[in-house]
């Protein structure tokens, strides 16, 4: 009845080890189906992302423990030269449940509250379910984890506030202008940072986005993705600066892309209508003296990182609330696990009494009418329900320090003379 979690993540191993041990979707399917078909596991699932590769396994035999699974994965990836068992963590029983609840609720992420991980856990479960590798335990474990994540998102602020430079820039623009749908945006640079900023802008309802890049085709590709199809040649974009309410720069350069003189002329043409410049470049893309101009709001990476740090601090203050939700769900999950342990005894107990009832009724089958026999059957059913109520309730009750599930099971089986159940997961 054990659930083992074994894996590497950003806390236990450097990126080169995480890259070496990660599994593609094809490898994921091959790995978990191999565990099942070889008789090593009843159930298996793998969560594999850039920051973690984690196995969740219900062993089929005693020999399948944490150390076995570490070696099994290392061997599967042919990574014995690079990867060592000490790069792994191991969790068991409720420790496994706690871990996946923390992962799904984004408090085990590299960036606290980063919500992308929930989708990755859901994808891992989808793969396990589609390959018939997710049985009753992993299915319940995952659905409880999804429920935990939903409660954490709705009842805490752990995922609120920008914690990336590009998203912080967009949030700042929204705070200043409120309605971005009415604003015209210029993106200078179509690299990874610029692309993220543009997509965040689009999510905040900014639709009038114009893109310029040294390589025009790259700007055109991003514009097509956003559905704007609005680009400017890099050589001439400065002629249009006055048209924009928000300017985002994210380009690799040793010289300033925008200087004070250019922006001064732009502001004259704009009749001093406010402009936000979000400088996401490193080195900086915009001359700091631009901030001296009237109605010109310039924010660079350092200013945005200050916002990010404050948001991370706010998220950290939500951790006690998140942990309280996890603890509550852990108790419920543990109680459910306990019901699985007592289920065979409950079934055997009910079966024995039903068998006794049917034998006794059979003795009267030809001595009474069919109508009377049915009344007797209904009566004995009610009696059996009342007789079995207390022992079943006792088996299902939460455990405390004075007893255990095995002791309860043994007591009931001895009192009612039940045969030992067949061992299965």
Swiss-Prot record:
Site description Important for activity, residues in chain: 99
Any GO MF annotation of the entry: NADP binding
Family matches, as InterPro entries: 4pyrrol_synth_GluRdtase (IPR000343), 4pyrrol_synth_GluRdtase_dimer (IPR015896), 4pyrrol_synth_GluRdtase_N (IPR015895), GluRdtase_CS (IPR018214), GluRdtase_dimer_dom_sf (IPR036453), GluRdtase_N_sf (IPR036343), NAD(P)-bd_dom_sf (IPR036291), Shikm_DH/Glu-tRNA_Rdtase (IPR006151)
Entry keywords, A to Z: Chlorophyll biosynthesis, NADP, Oxidoreductase, Porphyrin biosynthesis
Broad EC category: oxidoreductase
Catalytic residues, chain numbering: 50
Record has Iron as a keyword: no
Pathway: Porphyrin-containing compound metabolism; protoporphyrin-IX biosynthesis; 5-aminolevulinate from L-glutamyl-tRNA(Glu): step 1/2; Porphyrin-containing compound metabolism; chlorophyll biosynthesis
Reactions listed under catalytic activity: (S)-4-amino-5-oxopentanoate + tRNA(Glu) + NADP(+) = L-glutamyl-tRNA(Glu) + NADPH + H(+)
Record comment regarding domains: Possesses an unusual extended V-shaped dimeric structure with each monomer consisting of three distinct domains arranged along a curved 'spinal' alpha-helix. The N-terminal catalytic domain specifically recognizes the glutamate moiety of the substrate. The second domain is the NADPH-binding domain, and the third C-terminal domain is responsible for dimerization.
Reported function: Catalyzes the NADPH-dependent reduction of glutamyl-tRNA(Glu) to glutamate 1-semialdehyde (GSA).
Family (UniProt): Belongs to the glutamyl-tRNA reductase family.
Note: During catalysis, the active site Cys acts as a nucleophile attacking the alpha-carbonyl group of tRNA-bound glutamate with the formation of a thioester intermediate between enzyme and glutamate, and the concomitant release of tRNA(Glu). The thioester intermediate is finally reduced by direct hydride transfer from NADPH, to form the product GSA.
Name under which the protein is recorded: Glutamyl-tRNA reductase
Native source species: Pelodictyon phaeoclathratiforme (strain DSM 5477 / BU-1)
Organism ancestry: Bacteria, Pseudomonadati, Chlorobiota, Chlorobiia, Chlorobiales
């Amino acid at each position: 009845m054990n659930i083992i979690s074994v894996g590497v993540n950003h806390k236990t191993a450097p990126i080169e080890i995480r890259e070496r041990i990660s599994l593609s979707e094809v490898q994921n399917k091959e790995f978990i189906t191999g565990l099942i078909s070889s008789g090593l596991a009843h159930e298996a699932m793998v969560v594999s992302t850039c920051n973690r590769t984690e196995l969740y396994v219900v062993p089929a035999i005693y020999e399948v423990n944490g150390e076995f699974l570490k070696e099994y994965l290392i061997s599967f990836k042919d990574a014995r030269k690079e990867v060592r068992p000490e790069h792994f963590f191991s969790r068991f029983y409720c420790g496994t449940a706690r871990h996946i609840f923390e992962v799904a609720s984004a408090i085990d992420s590299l960036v606290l509250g980063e919500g992308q991980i929930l989708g990755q856990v859901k994808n891992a479960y989808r793969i396990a379910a589609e390959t018939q590798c997710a049985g009753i335990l992993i299915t319940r474990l995952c659905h409880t984890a999804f429920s935990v994540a939903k409660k954490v998102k709705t009842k805490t602020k752990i995922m609120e506030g920008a914690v990336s430079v590009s998203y912080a820039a967009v949030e700042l623009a929204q705070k200043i202008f409120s309605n971005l749908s009415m604003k015209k945006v210029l993106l200078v640079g179509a690299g990874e940072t610029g692309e993220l900023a543009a997509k965040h802008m689009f999510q905040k309802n900014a639709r009038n986005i114009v893109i310029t890049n040294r390589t025009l085709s790259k700007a055109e590709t991003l514009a097509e993705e956003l559905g704007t199809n609005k680009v400017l040649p890099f050589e001439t974009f400065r002629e249009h600066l006055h048209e924009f309410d928000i300017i985002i720069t994210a380009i690799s350069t040793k010289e300033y892309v925008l200087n004070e003189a250019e922006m001064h002329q732009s502001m004259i043409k704009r009749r001093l209508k406010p402009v936000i410049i979000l400088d996401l470049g490193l080195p900086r893309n915009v001359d700091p003296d631009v901030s001296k101009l009237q109605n010109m709001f310039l924010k660079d990476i350092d200013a945005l990182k200050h916002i990010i740090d404050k948001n991370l601090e706010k998220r950290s203050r939500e951790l006690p609330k998140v942990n309280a939700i996890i603890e509550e769900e852990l108790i419920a999950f543990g109680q459910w696990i306990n019901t699985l342990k007592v289920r065979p005894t409950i079934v055997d107990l009910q079966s024995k009494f039903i068998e006794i009832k049917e034998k006794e009724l059979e003795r009267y089958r030809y001595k009474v009418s069919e109508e009377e026999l049915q009344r007797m059957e209904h009566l004995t059913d009610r009696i059996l329900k009342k007789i079995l109520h207390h022992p079943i309730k006792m088996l299902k009750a939460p455990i405390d320090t004075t007893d255990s599930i095995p002791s309860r099971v043994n007591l009931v089986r001895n009192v009612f003379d039940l045969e030992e159940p067949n061992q299965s997961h």
